Amino acid sequence: MAKRNFVSTYSLLWVLVIAFITGAVFSCTDNSEAEKRLTSAEALMNQHPDSALAILQGIDRSSLSSGNGKARYALLMSQALDKNYIDTTTFDILQPAIDYYIDKGTPDEKLTTFYYQGRIYQNKGDEDNAMLSFINAREIT
């Protein structure tokens, strides 16, 4: 009888471990659909910015849980708006990219973030800060 209880306890423990591991894996990849959409939008950005914008507008931003995911969305959305001639004059959209990429981004991410920061300053008519952003971008290269 003791052996039988041991086996059932062991089986229950094994099921719980598998359930925990499965939950951990899925919680880490819970935004994989959003990440796929970001990748699709990025691939379309230069040739079909209107399609990239449509994809980005269809992403539920609350599904982006990581700082990198939020920053990537912010930068891609800023690019899509600019490439579709939609001028923005606030940093509401780009700010997550500025906050994340300036410290943690690759050189390309930093450069692109500074460039779109400069574009927003240009749209606001603030040529001095636009030039500073472009100079910061230039210094990264």
Predicted regions and their residues:
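A "functional boundary" signal
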Residues: 2-10, 14-141
